[in-house]
Every structure is written in C-alpha cells, then in structure tokens.
Amino acid sequence: MTKEIVTKAQERFEQSHQSLSREFAGIRAGRANASLLDRIQVEYYGAPTPLNQLASITVPEARVLLISPFDKSSIKDIERAINESDLGINPANDGSVIRLVIPALTEETRRDLAKEVKKVGENAKIAIRNIRRDAMDEAKKQEKNKEITEDDLKSLEKDIQKATDDAVKHIDEMTANKEKELLEV
C-alpha cells in the first residue's frame, strides 16, 4: 500500500513531463517541425478537428512545412485556422497544398521565447510540487489512520521526496535543452 503512493506520484510526474514536452514542441525554434501544428484545430464540417487528422504535414526544407490536405475542399478552413492561431506564420495556399515558411528568429524573439520556456518550465515544477504535496498528504492520512507506522511514514516521505527531486531535475534539463535550442543561431 505504501509503495503504491510513490508509484502513483511517479506516474503523475511522468504525465507532467509529457505535457511539458508537448508544450515545448509548440514553441518554435526557427526550424520547421511538424509538431508546431499539433495544437491547431480546424473547423471541419462544423466540428473542431486536429490539423494532423485532415492533412499530411511534411518538412521538405529546413524552414518550410508543407501541408497536403486529404480533402482539397478543406484547404480554406486549414488556412483560416493557421491564420487565427498564435503561430505568427502566414500560410501560402497554392490551391492543392499550403506552404508555411518559418521565419528566422530575431535575437529579441529568441530571448522572449527563452523567457516563455522558463515560465512554462516553472509551471511544470509547480505541478510537480503539487503532486508531491498530494502524495505526502495521502501518506500522513494513512499514518493517522494507523494503516502505516511512523517509521513507514518517514521512509515513504523520503521516497516521495527523492522521486520529486528526480522529476524536478528532469524538468530543469528539458528547460535548459529547449533554451539552448532557442538561443542557437
């Protein structure tokens, strides 16, 4: 029962890491990457649909994304969704495909994006600390209900703290890598 708390916390830590990875994938680094478009929803026949379900997305050049809709009639809807997104990239529609040329990042934009990365990383660490608090509360509740001894509680708290430290370290590494990627010219 006691190790179950640590295991559950570690699973939630892993979900936070995956969420952070998805968040970082959406922050463009001056290079074309299909994951930039993961969060774009297209209004398709009245329902919001993820762009990657409506088109194939390829990277023919370092700073170009090519979007080939499966249904050519959806091209205007896809173009509108990209224009309305917060990407800041203008799509070029040639009737059958959409080209997205990723502009080179200015030094100022790079610094702004690096600040954004730090903020997102900090929010992920807050989520980790909340998960730790929940796990610690659960352990204390079990000790209070006499399900575990005080020694078990201390051991459990130590295990939870170690898992938390590992999770925070991983977030710090992910944040540092993304910042480095952004600040590379």
Curated annotation (Swiss-Prot):
Belongs to the RRF family. GO terms for biological process: translational termination. Signal peptide: none annotated. InterPro entries: Ribosome_recyc_fac, Ribosome_recyc_fac_dom, RRF_sf. CDD domains: RRF. Keywords: Cytoplasm, Protein biosynthesis. Responsible for the release of ribosomes from messenger RNA at the termination of protein biosynthesis. May increase the efficiency of translation by recycling ribosomes from one round of translation to another. Disulfide bonds: none annotated. It holds the Pfam family RRF. GO terms for cellular component: cytoplasm. GO terms for molecular function: ribosomal large subunit binding. The keyword Cytoplasm applies. It is found in: Cytoplasm. Gene3D superfamilies: 3.30.1360.40, Ribosome-recycling factor. It comes from the Bacteria. It comes from Streptococcus agalactiae serotype V (strain ATCC BAA-611 / 2603 V/R). The gene is frr. This is Ribosome-recycling factor.
